Amino acid sequence: MKDILKLSLFCSLIILSISADASEWKKRSIYQLMTDRFATSIENPPTCDVFKNNYCGGDHKGLEQKLDYIQGMGFDAIWISPIVKNAEGSYHSYHTTDFYALNEHFGTEEDIQSLIKACHDRDIYVMLDVVANHVALVGNDFSGINPFNSPEHYHEPCAITDWANYVMVENCRLADLPDLKHENNWVSDELLRWIKYMVEKYHLDGLRVDTVPEVPKWFWTKFNRVCGIFQIGEVFNGDERYVHSYHGPLTSTFNYPLYFHIGDAFRDRDLTILNDYYSRQKPVFDDGGYSPLLGVFIGNHDNARFLYEGQRTKEQLDMASVFSIFWEGIPVIYYGDEQYFSGGPDPGCREALWDYGYKTDSPLYIYYKKGLYYRKKLELWDKDIEQLTFAKEYYAFRRGNDVLTVISLAENNVQVTINNEGKGKIKDGKYCNIFKHDDCFDSAETITVSMEKAPKVYIPSDKIDNDY
């Protein structure tokens, strides 16, 4: 019996070490969801009014029941909301009151354990959102916060008024949320004990780290070492060097510089803006090999949906989404995009998915299904990337020497001509579009692609799977 227990523990440690490895995470694609808004186990739930800023009934049990929906799109990792106890009304779960108790609105201990086991049984990684910067809005009465229940655990109240002042950013309150005093050894040690406890108790595979610049880098370095699994941090900033400075303290970050470039390109209807990222910002992230680990996204819970701006169309969302899947990095897709949600700034972008239905025949659901299937089949994460040609109305790039992606903003058909010579050429052979298998070409010194209002990804014809 002892030998069996030892073997079981050894296997568990192997699984944990594999999931903690950045080289494994770069192979994954992440579906971000807000637990309170994705799925509910309540029968006949009421319509969710997002502007009431309260719980709508989403829970871990409901999420587990909808794993088929997520896996059907090809996602093999989920990012879920923080699970710790929060101030009442904090449906987003970013306002902690007890670091060692669960948010009862999301379910029981058994529910979260069951969800994680169900995910692991399907080879879906679980990424938990965690907050180590602040606690709930309690003013200066910390008696109800566990374990940080004393004024000495916090910085003196002040507001962040200058985001270029790192001392202010690290020591003052974000939105009046009490700011934990990491230089207090007991506070930092307790936070490190807590994250180690969470990782081990729930067998987590990765962490999404909230409010990264608001916490000193020296703490994140310790956090990284103690938690022992992949972390991806929120550095809400468009400056590539500023974002890159958090690589090392944490495993990775979300690619906010690219997010802003994508938004600008589609807002201004000018895809040459993407060249600025490729030629000026991407080389910064290439230093140290971080580009393949960056989270590539076009929306999240903090920003208005892609379709909120009236100039943008569903076809453009299809283009941007396919771009994010085939670009260099880890695709991170925000729940509801597959149903073309168009909510405005927070809280408008936090719709309840059950109010709209879990349709698996929407065009973007199918784009995800096909795109993520081929991303994995072709092992895209090991392929280099090169920008091939661009203009205001189109953009083309390759991955390796056998994957060509083209997007277009043209109102009518446009011919995209690609010079296929030199070191980075597409290798010889017949290529077909993964989204329309009879759309093919034979590689030559010049490749011409006719673009309609749909993204195109060409791969060798012998790699096409008729089931996808």
Q: Which stretches of residues belong to each language-model region?
A:
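Short, polar loop/linker segments at the starts of domains and inter-domain junctions
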Residues: S41-H60, G310-K314, D438-E452
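Sec-dependent signal peptide recognition
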Residues: K2-F10
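Hydrophobic h-region of N-terminal signal peptides that target proteins for export
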Residues: C11-S19
